[in-house]
Amino acid sequence: MKVGVVGASGYVGGETLRLLVNHPDVEIAAVTSRQHVGEYLHRVQPSLRGFTDLTFSELDYDRLSDSCDLVFTAVPHGTATDIVRALYDRDIKVIDLSADYRLHDPADYTKWYGWEHPHPDYLSKSVFGIPELHREEIRSAKLVSCPGCMAVTSILALAPPVREGLVDTEHIVVDSKIGSSGAGAGAGTAHAMRAGVIRPYKPAKHRHTGEIEQELSGIAGKKIRVSMSPHAVDVVRGILCTNHVFLTREASEKDLWKMYRQAYGEERFVRLIRDKKGLYKFPDPKFLVGSNFCDIGFDLDEDNNRLVAISASDNLMKGAAGSAIQNMNIMAGLDEMSGLRYTPLTPV
């Protein structure tokens, strides 16, 4: 299978390339960048040194159409709209890693991103790329939009209790912690100011809230509101979501475990975590770095009828490039784990 990557100079594009160069069923046919035309990939993504001699090329739709079966777009939010449409119209399968086709309602782009979507009629053509929820739609899709990193991590934890009708849909709270790579590859604040922080950002209006509301509303069959507050923490990779929901009826720990096992027992990239002893009783992103797993656990606050669903992932893997490769495998009829058989790195 021949693939292309549009916009491969950032963290997400680089991680996508790292997975593709090791994928047994893939040949990278083209990699584009506006800034680095003619440069070797490893000059911009040094981890690829010795794995490929490819150079960055200009964005040429005809070349991509002639040489690629599928193209990944890993460009900044707001810049993928025209690129994705042009590829789609040339009958190329597309996996978009930006936010530009995640939301189905054009009004949500005005609400969450502050701009009108230029191609609203294409939003309905996109499948939201969480395989654990939309595998069959992904299998036949021509355009898949990968979810935001905090969105997918939270949605996977919340989907089962919402589906079971266990949740007070008026009071869902998502508390997220995310590493610095989630902010992108641009030069940022000095290390002296970033190190050691636990810093709230966009505590009331983070954009991923819209994705969580969209997916949970679809599962519940009614409009759901989510209160989400993310925090930047002093790690490079990793997301931890502590999701608080209040139960509408009594449920025991045994009931909840059965619910999660029924939802994810056969899923190869979701692991259920809750040990009675030791240090690792709940999901911890430290033990997911470099892997495509999302770990899910929970605790039950019986006094307040509150379920605390805890989920963790690597924001560049299950939260971005790993999900993209998983979606590609499904679209191409490949083994879903192909190119993704990585155990987490530890220690890091």
UniProtKB/Swiss-Prot annotation:
Q: Where in the cell is it found?
A: Cytoplasm
Q: Which GO terms describe its molecular function?
A: N-acetyl-gamma-aminoadipyl-phosphate reductase activity; N-acetyl-gamma-glutamyl-phosphate reductase activity; NAD binding; NADP+ binding
Q: Which reaction does it catalyse?
A: [amino-group carrier protein]-C-terminal-N-(1-carboxy-5-oxopentan-1-yl)-L-glutamine + phosphate + NADP(+) = [amino-group carrier protein]-C-terminal-N-(1-carboxy-5-phosphooxy-5-oxopentan-1-yl)-L-glutamine + NADPH + H(+); [amino-group carrier protein]-C-terminal-gamma-(L-glutamyl-5-semialdehyde)-L-glutamate + phosphate + NADP(+) = [amino-group carrier protein]-C-terminal-gamma-(5-phospho-L-glutamyl)-L-glutamate + NADPH + H(+)
- Output the SUPFAM superfamilies linked to this UniProt entry: Glyceraldehyde-3-phosphate dehydrogenase-like, C-terminal domain, NAD(P)-binding Rossmann-fold domains
Keyword hit for NADP: yes
**Example of a GO biological process term:** arginine biosynthetic process via ornithine
Keywords of this protein's UniProt record, alphabetized? Amino-acid biosynthesis, Arginine biosynthesis, Cytoplasm, Lysine biosynthesis, NADP, Oxidoreductase
Catalytic residues identified in the record: 149
Disulfide-bonded cysteine pairs: these are none
Residues the record lists as binding NADP(+): 9-12, 315
Q: What does this protein do?
A: Involved in both the arginine and lysine biosynthetic pathways.
- Kindly provide the name given to this protein in its UniProt entry: Putative [LysW]-L-2-aminoadipate/[LysW]-L-glutamate phosphate reductase
Which species does this protein come from?
Cenarchaeum symbiosum (strain A)
